């Protein structure tokens, strides 16, 4: 006898389709998050950004979440409004911030009145001794960096809101089933966005033989549009699930200020929070500057543009091999009874990873070498 399917989440295919929608949205957001990291040197040469300006712009992503406590408000919104509303809202906020950042990096911004305003304002320096070092704006920053930081702040709000919303959505669809595997799979797919960014950001910035850094950001904005479409599709899919179950959208108990007291007095909360702080303080800042660090400390000789290793086609070949690594290692987790197939897939993934590393070495660029890191 076969199990009777009662609702969408009782179907493994529909459950994993919902997960794929959420994971792809996060994948797109992770691509945009580090879209300028592999082309920091190009931002310096074409837009006049120095390392301090670049660092403040990158740090702007978390400014509102951490120092204005927006992430706490995002959690309250999620509790009050539910997964569907918050998912679409987060996608829209990410896209809004991404568009601002794209405009800041584009040639259209140069010479405008808005550029003049940002040049003459937000030049904070020593007059704010306590919070000055953490502000996204400072004296000496190019106007494009200031506006990009403003857009990145909005993007960061949407991205972190999306992160907690996706986790909530996975629990809703996989509760009582393979929840841990689903969460791990979502995070694995999302993290591939970092490798995608490292490979394709320089590719689009240099496409056509000329440097146009806004093309790389445009690529990220297009993916943010895809992310919003994924969230909207999930919205209707999740709504259909609630119609089948005859329940209103699942929401938590109303927020009470006393809940914050219970949270901050929990030892488990602080252990998990400190673990996350250590992880994020080590990994994310490293990703922002890793490519430039390799460029400054390694004597790299890029391949001749007239050869295969220096051409555009190798970018796509290397990315396809990366997908083989990801697909082989990921699919092996689902093989339980056929050990030969399981180890065969793992072997293919290992061989593909070796080829991937070799291609990164032969291309001779810092971004292709660092692209191994997310895998």
Predicted region positions:
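Conserved MFS/SLC helix-loop-helix module at the cytosolic interface between two early adjacent transmembrane helices
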Residues: 68-125
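Central cavity-lining transmembrane alpha-helices of secondary-active solute carriers
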Residues: 59-76, 316-331
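Cytoplasmic helix-loop-helix junction between adjacent transmembrane helices
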Residues: 145, 151-189
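Symmetry-related core transmembrane helices of the 12-TM Major Facilitator Superfamily/SLC fold
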Residues: 214-234
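Juxtamembrane intracellular "pre-TM" segments in multi-pass secondary transporters
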Residues: 2-12, 242-273
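Extracytoplasmic gate region of multi-pass secondary transporters
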Residues: 36-40, 266-329, 360
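C-terminal transmembrane helical hairpin of 12-TM major facilitator-type secondary transporters
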Residues: 339-375
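Glycine-rich segments within core transmembrane alpha-helices of 12-TM secondary carriers
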Residues: 180-205
């Amino acid at each position: 006898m076969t199990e009777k399917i009662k609702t969408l989440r009782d179907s493994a295919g529909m459950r994993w389709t919902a997960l794929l929608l959420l994971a792809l949205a996060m994948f797109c957001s992770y691509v945009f998050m580090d879209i300028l990291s592999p082309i920091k040197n190009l931002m310096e040469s074409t837009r006049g950004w120095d390392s301090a300006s670049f660092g403040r712009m990158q740090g702007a992503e978390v400014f509102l979440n951490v120092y204005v406590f927006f992430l706490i408000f995002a959690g309250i919104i999620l509790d009050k409004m539910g997964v569907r509303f918050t998912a679409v809202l987060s996608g829209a906020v990410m896209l809004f911030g991404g568009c601002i950042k794209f405009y800041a990096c584009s040639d259209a911004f140069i010479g405008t009145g808005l550029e003049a305003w940002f040049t003459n304002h937000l030049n904070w320096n020593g007059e704010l001794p306590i919070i000055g070092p953490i502000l996204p704006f400072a004296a000496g920053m190019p106007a494009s960096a200031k506006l990009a930081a403003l857009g990145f702040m909005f993007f960061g709000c949407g991205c972190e809101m999306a992160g907690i919303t996706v986790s909530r959505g996975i629990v809703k669809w996989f509760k009582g089933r393979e929840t841990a595997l689903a969460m791990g799979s979502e995070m694995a797919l999302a993290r591939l966005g970092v490798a995608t960014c490292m490979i394709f950001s320089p590719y689009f910035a240099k496409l056509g033989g000329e440097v146009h850094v806004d093309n790389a950001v445009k690529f990220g904005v297009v993916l943010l549009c895809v992310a919003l479409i994924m969230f909207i599709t999930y919205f209707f899919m999740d709504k259909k699930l609630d119609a089948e179950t005859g329940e209103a959208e699942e929401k938590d108990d109303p927020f009470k200020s006393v809940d914050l007291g219970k949270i901050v007095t929990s030892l488990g909360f602080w252990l998990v929070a400190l673990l996350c702080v250590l992880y994020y303080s080590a990994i994310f800042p490293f990703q922002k500057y890793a490519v430039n660090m390799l460029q400054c400390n390694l004597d790299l000789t890029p391949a001749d543009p007239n050869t295969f290793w220096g051409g555009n086609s190798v970018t796509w070949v290397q990315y396809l091999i990366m997908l083989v690594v990801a697909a082989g290692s990921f699919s092996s987790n689902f093989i339980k009874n056929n050990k030969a197939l399981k180890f065969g897939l793992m072997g293919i993934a290992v061989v593909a990873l070796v080829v991937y590393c070799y291609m990164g070495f032969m291309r001779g660029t810092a971004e292709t070498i660092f692209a191994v890191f997310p895998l």
